[in-house]
Amino acid sequence: MGRYIGPVCRLCRREGVKLYLKGERCFGPKCPIVKRHPNKNYPPGQHGPTQRAARRPSEFALQLREKQKLKRVYGILERQFRRHFDEAERRPGLTGDNLLQILESRLDNVVYRLGFADSRRQARQLVRHGHFLVNGRKTDIPSYQVRPGDIIAVRPESRRREYFKVLEETAKNKAVPAWLSRDLETMSGRVLRLPTRDEIDIPPVNTQLVVEYYSRR
């Protein structure tokens, strides 16, 4: 499955906001977005400095930027993101809210929300390497959709690794959203229910513009 392997801080610069793609580093003074001089706050690339002073973006450009921003927050490429959008359209209710709920219900995101990884990118790698069980079964598909009642746990064999030994202590400082519960003694978490829009903590994204982007294609 394809994935972005380039510099992730470049993605934040392109969108003009912090997307929190590097975990704890994004909250500290070492974040390139924080360190960057205000006069150099423009998109990356040869023509970046001229883009800031360009004419007002078109409606399509605004829709595209919101779509790209949401994709990059969750670390998903276009084909898979479009599948998630199509599924959101089929569900009853607001398509934008459904899309966010589907993205939050991905296994790699739930691993991140439970505090078992510093970033979604790291969570995706841990899942792909088979370190987690879902309801007692090894699951290595990052896009797997969890459901209320599902139990996500670190594999007993993986708990012997140094990373997870340290994690048992460091995860104590990481808050867990209300729609999840966590037990650090068993290194597991439970999905209590699906999240509501207000409970999804991500950089501001106008999901209506994302819906409009795909509606015109």
Swiss-Prot record:
HAMAP family membership: Ribosomal_uS4_B
Region (Disordered): 37-56
SMART domains reported in the protein's UniProt record: Ribosomal_S4, S4
Family statement drawn from the similarity comment of this UniProt entry: Belongs to the universal ribosomal protein uS4 family.
InterPro entries noted in UniProt: Ribosomal_uS4, Ribosomal_uS4_bac-type, Ribosomal_uS4_CS, Ribosomal_uS4_N, S4_RNA-bd, S4_RNA-bd_sf
A GO molecular function held by the record: rRNA binding
Domain of life: Bacteria
PROSITE patterns: RIBOSOMAL_S4, S4
Protein name (Swiss-Prot/TrEMBL): Small ribosomal subunit protein uS4
UniProt xrefs under Pfam families: Ribosomal_S4, S4
Description of how the protein assembles with itself and partners: Part of the 30S ribosomal subunit. Contacts protein S5. The interaction surface between S4 and S5 is involved in control of translational fidelity.
Role summary: One of the primary rRNA binding proteins, it binds directly to 16S rRNA where it nucleates assembly of the body of the 30S subunit. With S5 and S12 plays an important role in translational accuracy.
